[in-house]
Amino acid sequence: MFNFLIKANHESESKKTELLLKNGDIIYALSSTSRIDFQALKIFTKQNNLTELELKNEKFPIKKNYFQIRNPKRRFPWQTPKRMHSKELGILAENRNFSRNAIIIPVDVFWGKSPERQDNWLKLLFRESWEGTSFIRNLFKLLFNGRNVKIFFHKPLEVDDIFNSPESDKNLVLKTERLLRARFRKNRKAYLGPDISNRRTLVTSILNSNSIKNYIESESKGNKKTTTKLRKKASKYVWEICSDMSYPFIYLYDRALTWFWNSRYENLEVLNFEEIRKIAPSTSLIFSPCHRSHIDYLALSYLLYYKDLMLPQIVAGKNLNLPLVGPLLRKGGAFFMRRSFSNNRLYSVVFYEHLRKLMQRGHSIEFFPEGGRSRSGKLMPPRPGIISMILRSFLGMDEKQVSFVPISINYEKVLEGNSYINEVMGAEKKKENLKDIFSVFKDFRNYLGEAYLQFGEPISLNALLEEYPLDDFSSEKDWLFKVTPVLGKRIMTNINNSTVVTSTALFSLAILNSDGFSISKQELVSRIELLKSLLKEKKYSTKTLICEKTGEEIIDQMRKLGFLSKEDINDRISLTNLE
């Protein structure tokens, strides 16, 4: 009836899966009993000449070529939800001779997670999320996001291992359902991130953690008044730290940032991302970009959103927790960290426990190893504090796969360039305030050129622990003192290896040793070309990218960016008019 409302695209976990989809002897395993998910898959397979869903198929014991994983249900609101089992899986368990040779492909259906731009705020509210579904919600998903559906085909189940098991039919059904749910949950988490719908639950779990309870008990020494006081203080710290990520807000950010990137930047170039996509479903990612500008937060989150990876929880300095700005950043996933808390043991315990809970729940995390913005383009030494805390949080969770992802972010024009020039000229660095942050927006009206995000070689935390094992937890402090700088150096090295030499960098270097107040255009072009040839001949690393524009094009780009006066249209370029 509503077929005309549904338009889907798809992604397959492997090339083998893609080929098998045209094999008529496959069985689909849907992640839910949703009728609109079923309808979307039915329409998509028919339109793309893939194996269609069949309600009657005599070749299979289940008499059709699909089954659906059933969600827990309850008849009355006060009842505990009861786990429901797939009847079709029970039949497959009874017919093991058939099932061990069957091709079973699990299927996920996502509504509104495709990277097309939304043109209606209602679409933003009824995209895929962790929230429960209902008839009304499904109807709105169909109406507002039916043209924006993504279908994900997993690799086939390992039926030979499953159905050769000596277990009873009942246990086999339970085992297969657990396996399927784990796959669906992992894939859903990779696309949406962990369930963030209840901030209070996270806060409560942190406050009830053993580390905080033990600290309060040791400090209060049984004094109820002191215990209450410390617990209130811990609660205050947790609420101060935690993010408040909101899907509707994120979708609205998407619309605003799409306008910003498309209207102000010539290009947002993404390099070496595919390796990160490959490891994302099985690995918790800790994004570690260099820090040039406040735009860094937006650029990386925007990219991950459009690449269909979970948005990270972002470590932000408490100096950004300003009125109006702070709540908006929290909605986008930022959590706040004080610059120094070495003398506040309770805050340290709370922050550590918060970080540990994020890692346990499978959140990806983003932090800036330099600690502050380096607008000069030169990387600063890594700050050991947050790196050390992440290492501590990971100890005891060896079964989790965690990787640091170094990222080099480069701009042709940095928005905060003027404030940096003032600091170089002797002005003191100001504390962040609303006026300074909003003053950056005045440059939003201007052309900002190109931006580059290049992903460096991931660093496996598991491999690092094998290289530097901690044999005795009593020596944890010495171990951290030894390993933290090693990890920090590797992150910064991989960022540096992935740098992009922009047109602005080439232009700046070319005029740096000019001995007069002007330079001929011909001389400037030849200097730029010489620098490019030297950089290519003595490339810093295989991942280093050098601007491909010619010398003439780079000079034109500097005019567009506003660095050269419009008066410089003759054969000589004045170096006193540089802006």
Q: Could you tell me what each predicted segment is?
A:
Residues M1-E579:
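Membrane-interfacial terminal anchoring regions of lipid-handling membrane enzymes
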